């Protein structure tokens, strides 16, 4: 039987990573967090003071840096950066890094490579449009900016990060704009993706809906 690819695309704070992890566990699929890869590159560039316009230096980084994912843990050059890649400074810069052409092309190749011959579920911005346009299940998971900001704000509160709801909402809207207007793989819904608005849905509601779609292609 051919391997199954499930693509969940959605804006920041739509709940796609939470949902993807649950479904991966439920179906025993490999979960690939494409956004975490961009976050790790963003972290490396920031910590090494590399300008986002310095394409030669960024290319060197892409050719030498080691990204590894083991379950819920993320490793950058063998160092656990799971917590660091969720920091406010990463949230504020990851969309800029993700809009750099050489970064996207390099990571798309890596995402395809690690997904090869496996049942996988990936979440991101361009999984169903660019990485795997032939994915058997494509979900476009959305929610209102206010609801997404509320979710992110609560995450920050749990981590005791000092930030206001209004700051989170502003950041969400800025990321939406950058993601949807960038030249390289802009964030758009795939023609054959199922749009699911999670604003007023529980996690279980969303998981059950997507699970039914997966059962149809098994």
Regions found by a protein language model. Name each.
Residues 6-8:
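Hydrophobic anchor at the beta1->P-loop junction of P-loop NTPases
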Residues 11:
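P-loop (Walker A) phosphate-binding loop of NTP-binding proteins
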Residues 16:
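Conserved lysine of the Walker
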Residues 19:
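Hydrophobic positions on the alpha1 helix immediately C-terminal to the Walker A/P-loop
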Residues 26-88:
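N-terminal phosphate/diphosphate-binding loop that engages ATP/GTP or pyrophosphate donors
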Residues 35, 78, 107, 121, ...:
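Residue-level signal for inorganic ion chemistry
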Residues 61, 70-71, 111-118, 125, ...:
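Small-molecule kinase domains that catalyze NTP-dependent phosphoryl transfer to phosphate-bearing small molecules
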Residues 85, 89-94, 98-159:
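ATP-dependent NMP and nucleoside kinases share a basic, alpha-helical "lid"
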